[in-house]
């Protein structure tokens, strides 16, 4: 349905070639079942044309195209064919059961291709175009013809090829930037010139098909639309030969987001883009780069303190589209070394903490120190940090520094600095292992009778830089006190946990003495 205040002549037809050109990407082969699943997703999200494969390439490709053609509910199903009679017949057979089938046939037109690959003259190629397009048109009503390497083809000859294809019955004319050589203004002018110079141009829809060798595939695709093309060929996640194709999700969101300067529209349901991206990534085993536009993990993630502050005040300060518009649940404020105090406070409130000003500042300082040491900060890291901070507020004994020397030979040695009731104490001790050395050091610095009953370690989060959470239980005079502490360094976490339990024993003793005297 044409949207309000938009005309049908400004509709951009979205042609997806993930299952054909995308699968030609080395290593991106999909199984029969995966192709069917991807095709169902594309059909369901409003893609207009699905190029389901290259039927002559293999029995498996033929069967996949035929099955997709039988099951498609809305999309036109296209099969690719070289300008060879056998290819065209095979493609026609594959799509014959589709509600709407298309044969997409192509031939090279550039001088370098004609001389070194085709070994044909310009006149011979014109004859091939006429014959093969007519053959395809006898099999289906919808025929697309492509001029391979169009952007390196002289414009006069390209006009003759286009005219011949339309005269033979082509309903769509595709002018690909096969090797990703064009720049946007050049590509725009090519379409404009051909549509002006070919008398029958209004009898066909013009199509763009851009590769990303210079990183210009999406920009060139949009430029082609501005030049008069009304079909864009693209792939999910931009997968394809060499550097890939124009990414479908980027084309769609550019059209939707910049409707203020581009009066175009398309039928694709953008809220399904992220799901489609994940499906194709899983099927091809090609991970999506983190900073990939629209569907990358970081597309709606913010770590910079300045950006996070702006996002908390008004999301439009740093987001030009909503995450929900592409199927992402919400924006992510990533906590890291670049995060600011405002974002840290917001994260604490999300986690259920409301700290006093001095507690917040202390926790923020410790958070920044942790972020300098740890690549990924998870909610569990922040919870462990704040719980430890709140528990340590009234501690009499505090860890200032710890150095441990450990190795395969000889005893392990720990050197520790503690602040005890405001006074600094330094000591070193040996032990049967680094943890034993740390605990022996504490016993020298703060002599006590408490016995170690429990020592447990587990990782708070995943990864080699995960924080270790250590639990320690000490008992004295029949009473047991347990404390937990977390740190990327297991030995530091062990010292903090031990001191936490020891502080609880000290505080308990201080409360018990006045109570005994009063009785």
From Swiss-Prot:
Residues annotated as binding Mn(2+): 21, 209, 211, 245
Substrates-to-products reaction catalysed: 3-methyl-2-oxobutanoate + acetyl-CoA + H2O = (2S)-2-isopropylmalate + CoA + H(+)
Subcellular localization: Cytoplasm
EC number from the UniProt entry: 2.3.3.13
Record-level GO cellular component terms: cytosol
Oligomeric form and interacting partners: Homodimer.
Name recorded for this polypeptide: 2-isopropylmalate synthase
Organism (species): Nitrobacter winogradskyi (strain ATCC 25391 / DSM 10237 / CIP 104748 / NCIMB 11846 / Nb-255)
């Amino acid at each position: 349905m044409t949207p309000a205040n938009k005309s049908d002549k400004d509709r951009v037809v979205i042609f997806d070639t993930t299952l054909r050109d995308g699968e030609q990407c080395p290593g991106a082969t999909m199984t029969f079942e995966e192709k069917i699943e991807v095709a169902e997703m594309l059909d369901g999200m409003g893609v207009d044309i699905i190029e389901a494969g290259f039927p002559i390439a293999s029995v498996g490709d033929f069967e996949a195209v035929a099955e997709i053609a039988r099951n498609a509910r809305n999309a036109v199903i296209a099969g690719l064919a070289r300008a060879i009679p056998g290819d065209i017949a095979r493609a026609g057979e594959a799509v014959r059961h589709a509600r709407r089938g298309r044969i997409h046939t192509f031939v090279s037109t550039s001088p370098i291709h004609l001389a070194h690959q085709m070994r044909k003259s310009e006149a011979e190629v014109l004859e091939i175009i006429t014959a093969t397009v007519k053959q395809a048109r006898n099999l289906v009503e919808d025929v697309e013809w492509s001029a391979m390497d169009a952007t390196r083809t002289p414009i006069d000859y390209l006009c003759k090829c286009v005219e011949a294809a339309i005269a033979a019955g082509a309903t769509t004319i595709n002018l690909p930037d096969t090797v990703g050589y064009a720049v946007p203004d050049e590509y725009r002018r090519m379409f404009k010139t051909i549509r002006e110079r070919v008398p029958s141009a209004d009898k066909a829809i013009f199509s763009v098909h851009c590769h990303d060798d210079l990183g210009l595939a999406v920009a060139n695709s949009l430029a082609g639309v501005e030049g008069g093309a009304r079909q864009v060929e693209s792939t999910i996640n931009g997968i394809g030969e060499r550097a890939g194709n124009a990414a479908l999700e980027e084309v769609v969101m550019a059209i939707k987001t910049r409707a203020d300067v581009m009066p175009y529209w398309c039928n694709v349901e953008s809220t399904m883009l992220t799901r489609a991206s994940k499906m194709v990534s899983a099927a091809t085993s090609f991970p999506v780069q983190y900073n990939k536009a629209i569907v990358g993990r970081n597309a709606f993630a913010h770590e910079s303190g300045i950006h996070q502050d702006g996002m908390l005040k008004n999301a439009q300060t740093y987001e030009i589209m909503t995450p929900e518009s592409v199927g992402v649940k919400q924006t992510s404020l990533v906590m890291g070394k670049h995060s600011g105090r405002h974002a840290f406070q917001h994260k604490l409130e999300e986690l259920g903490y409301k700290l006093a000003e001095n507690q917040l500042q202390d926790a923020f300082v410790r958070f920044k120190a942790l972020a300098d040491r740890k690549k990924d900060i998870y909610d569990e890291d922040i919870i462990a940090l704040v719980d430890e901070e709140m528990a340590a507020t009234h501690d009499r004994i505090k860890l200032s520094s710890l150095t441990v020397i450990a190795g395969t030979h000889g005893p392990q040695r720990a050197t520790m600095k503690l602040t005890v009731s405001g006074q600094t104490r330094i000591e070193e001790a040996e032990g049967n292992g680094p943890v034993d050395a740390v605990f022996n050091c504490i016993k020298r610095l703060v002599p006590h009778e408490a016995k170690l009953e429990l020592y447990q370690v587990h990782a708070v989060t995943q990864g080699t830089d995960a924080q270790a959470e250590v639990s320690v239980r000490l008992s004295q005079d029949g009473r047991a006190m347990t404390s937990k502490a977390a740190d990327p360094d297991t030995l530091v976490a062990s010292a903090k946990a031990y001191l936490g339990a020891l502080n609880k024993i000290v505080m308990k003793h201080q409360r018990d003495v006045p109570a005994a005297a009063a009785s």
